[in-house]
């Protein structure tokens, strides 16, 4: 099937040949808007570094696995809620008020997290940040699409996406910087507080920026819409008239759609009754779900925790390694920009998918090697000989674990290791200070850990989060490979394909449904990672993500069509059966014939006028 190239716009007016000059106003508008992407990336990633210190902060400890998962995952969970309601809110009140509201929510969330004195207060702050992210993720791209010059809209929307990755890099950098300033009492608070600065900058900028001309026009403010267009296009009359015609045509089409809805019911019911659109919506939603089931936000939200479990002890080193990994995630998306039109969506998606499967399998293998290489756990009889033994249920369950790696994976246990022989005991933690002491055995608080009565024992070191291993570098390198292969296709292609799959009347609703799918599975993955590692081990968790991605590969191979080079009408036909496609093609041909006859009549009329003159 050959793509149809349209020389004129939807309004029927030819697009001006010469692009307008970009003035200061456009640069200010674009720069202020994409700060929303930066805040999105920063506030979802800063938790990785901060959670090295928050669980041991005064007033917030002890913090078990469930609390850690909830504090991390509540933000994407509330982002789903914020994104769902922001669409209707921006249609009713305007894009600008919602963006200003999101900046204030970002500031409140940053301040609440920074001053949090209990786990509940921290949770409230993370809820605020999630709502702000939800608002920004939905409304800022719409604002950019409606308030920027036509020829740079794609660039600015892409810049918003890139700023998400840039925000993730900066979050790790600031985590590294602030980790040197009393991290357990002040440093982690500064990590959260820093996000308030760009949020305030965006707030101040948007006080002076206008509402989008499209929203103004659709809500009866025609004169104001023209004034905004004059600022955007620097007084270029040709472009202003063109854009006004586009907005008018869109408004008329939307009015027709609303009238159609009154006759046929809500769009969602029309989707359910239209098999090929329902099929496209299902495929689009599954692509968003698979993006999350591939484990990307496990890597991004728990970067520091994963690096620590690979055997890195120094927290500063952990955070700076996180910076390098986040840079991998930043540079990967440049690949689609160069190859997506040459290779096509399917090939690039399948390549990215295959790379993710291989890297997830290798991450799992790496952690299997780390586990097998970690210090063995002495049996119970050796523990009794060591002294300072108190028998209880927790101690018995910890002693049953095989080695250091399985021991530190449990939130109730830690490893008391002989620093010379790399052997030791898996002991229950001291809940007053889980990172420093065990509740019984040779690593209890106040006990001299030298014990000459125990063979080969000199000094015991308490390990709560990591084990000494020769394979530390392997999981870290494989995480870098994972981020590169994931970001070169899996990051952007679910969004690209969802923007192409649907007819105009169903696009907004179907994209909202698929976006909700993304956020819901984001929440599920973020909420279950730590519990999953306890239940099936770290390597088991990554192999499970690999299985999901293999299913995604099969799904894409058999069900996702190639959309490169096809028009919107042609893409819609790709989801139809043969009978539906024939009917659609006949209707489309009739429409093209009618348009051709209209053009001929216009040409004849023009020729007559020329002769008369």
UniProtKB/Swiss-Prot annotation:
Membrane topology: Multi-pass membrane protein
Main location: membrane
GO biological process, one term: myo-inositol transport
Extracellular side: 43-69, 118-119, 179-189, 301-317, 369-472, 537-539
Entry's transmembrane regions: 22-42, 70-90, 97-117, 120-140, 158-178, 190-210, 280-300, 318-338, 348-368, 473-493, 516-536, 540-560
Tissue: Expressed in the excretory canal cell and in pairs of amphid and sheath glia.
PROSITE patterns: MFS, SUGAR_TRANSPORT_1, SUGAR_TRANSPORT_2
Keyword set includes Glycoprotein: yes
Stretches in topological domain Cytoplasmic: 1-21, 91-96, 141-157, 211-279, 339-347, 494-515, 561-613
Family matches, as Gene3D superfamilies: MFS general substrate transporter like domains (1.20.1250.20)
Glycosylation site positions: 372, 451, 456
Subcellular location: Cell membrane; Perikaryon
Catalyzed chemical reaction(s): myo-inositol(out) + H(+)(out) = myo-inositol(in) + H(+)(in)
Region (Disordered) location: 594-613
An annotated Gene Ontology molecular function: myo-inositol:proton symporter activity
Pfam families (UniProt xref): Sugar_tr
Keyword annotations: Cell membrane, Glycoprotein, Membrane, Transmembrane, Transmembrane helix, Transport
Nucleotidyltransferase found in the keyword field: no
Triggers of expression: Induced by hyperosmotic stress.
Gene Ontology CC terms, in alphabetical order: apical plasma membrane; basal plasma membrane; perikaryon
Function according to Swiss-Prot or TrEMBL: H(+)-myo-inositol cotransporter. Probably by promoting the transport of myo-inositol regulates intracellular osmosis in response to hyperosmotic stress.
Name listed for the protein in its UniProt record: Proton myo-inositol cotransporter hmit-1.2
UniProt organism field: Caenorhabditis elegans
Upper lineage: Eukaryota, Metazoa, Ecdysozoa, Nematoda, Chromadorea
């Amino acid at each position: 099937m050959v793509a149809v190239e349209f020389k004129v716009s939807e309004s029927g007016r030819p697009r001006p040949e010469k692009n307008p000059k970009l003035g200061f106003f456009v640069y200010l508008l674009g720069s202020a808007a994409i700060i929303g992407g930066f805040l999105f990336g920063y506030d979802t990633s800063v938790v990785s570094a901060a959670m090295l210190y928050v669980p041991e902060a005064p007033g917030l400890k002890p913090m078990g696995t469930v609390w850690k998962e909830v504090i991390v995952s509540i933000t994407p969970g509330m982002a789903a809620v914020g994104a769902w309601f922001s669409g209707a809110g921006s249609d009713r009140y305007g894009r600008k008020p919602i963006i200003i509201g999101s900046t204030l929510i970002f500031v409140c969330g940053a301040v609440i997290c920074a001053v949090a004195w209990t786990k509940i207060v921290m949770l409230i702050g993370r809820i605020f940040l999630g709502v702000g992210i939800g608002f920004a993720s939905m409304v800022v791209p719409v604002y950019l699409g409606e308030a920027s010059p036509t020829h740079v809209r794609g660039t600015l929307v892409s810049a918003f996406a890139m700023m998400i990755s840039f925000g993730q890099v900066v979050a790790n950098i600031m985590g590294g910087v602030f980790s040197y300033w009393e991290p357990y009492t002040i440093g982690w608070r500064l990590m959260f507080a820093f996000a308030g600065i760009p949020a305030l900058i965006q707030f101040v900028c948007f006080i002076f920026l206008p509402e989008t001309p499209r929203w103004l026009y659709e809500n009866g403010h025609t004169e104001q819409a023209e004034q905004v267009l004059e600022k955007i296009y620097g007084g270029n009359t040709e472009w202003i008239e063109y854009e006004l015609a586009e907005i008018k045509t869109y408004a008329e089409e939307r009015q027709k759609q609303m009238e159609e809805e009154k006759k046929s019911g809500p769009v969602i019911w029309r989707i359910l009754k239209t098999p090929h659109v329902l099929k496209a919506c299902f495929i689009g939603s599954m692509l968003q779900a698979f993006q999350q089931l591939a484990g990307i936000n496990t890597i991004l939200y728990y970067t520091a925790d994963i690096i620590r479990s690979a055997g890195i002890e120094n927290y500063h080193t952990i955070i700076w390694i996180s910076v390098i990994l986040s840079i991998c995630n930043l540079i990967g998306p440049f690949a689609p920009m160069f190859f997506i039109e040459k290779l096509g969506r399917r090939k690039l998606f399948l390549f990215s998918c295959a790379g993710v499967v291989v890297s997830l399998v290798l991450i799992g293998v790496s952690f299997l090697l780390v586990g097998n290489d970690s210090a063995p756990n002495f049996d119970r009889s050796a523990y009794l000989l060591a002294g300072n033994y108190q028998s209880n249920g927790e101690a018995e369950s910890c002693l049953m674990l095989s080695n250091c790696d399985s021991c530190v994976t449990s939130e109730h246990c830690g490893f008391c290791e002989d620093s010379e022989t790399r052997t030791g005991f898996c002991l229950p933690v001291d809940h007053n200070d889980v990172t420093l002491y065990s509740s019984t055995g040779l690593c209890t608080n106040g006990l001299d850990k030298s014990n000459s009565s125990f063979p080969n024992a000199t000094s015991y070191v308490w390990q709560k989060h990591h084990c000494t291993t020769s394979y530390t570098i392997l999981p870290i390198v494989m995480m870098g490979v994972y981020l590169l292969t994931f970001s070169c296709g899996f990051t952007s292609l679910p969004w690209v394909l969802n923007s192409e799959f649907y007819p105009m009347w169903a696009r907004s609703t179907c994209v909202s449904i698929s976006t909700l799918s993304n956020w819901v599975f984001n929440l599920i993955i973020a909420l279950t990672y730590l519990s999953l590692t306890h239940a099936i081990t770290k390597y088991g968790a990554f192999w499970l993500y690999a299985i999901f991605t293999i299913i995604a590969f099969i799904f894409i191979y058999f069900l996702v069509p190639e959309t490169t080079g096809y028009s919107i009408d042609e893409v819609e036909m790709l989801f139809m059966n043969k009978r539906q496609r024939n009917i659609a093609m006949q209707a489309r041909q009739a429409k093209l014939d009618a348009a051709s006859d209209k053009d001929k009549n216009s040409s004849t009329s023009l020729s007559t006028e020329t002769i008369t003159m």
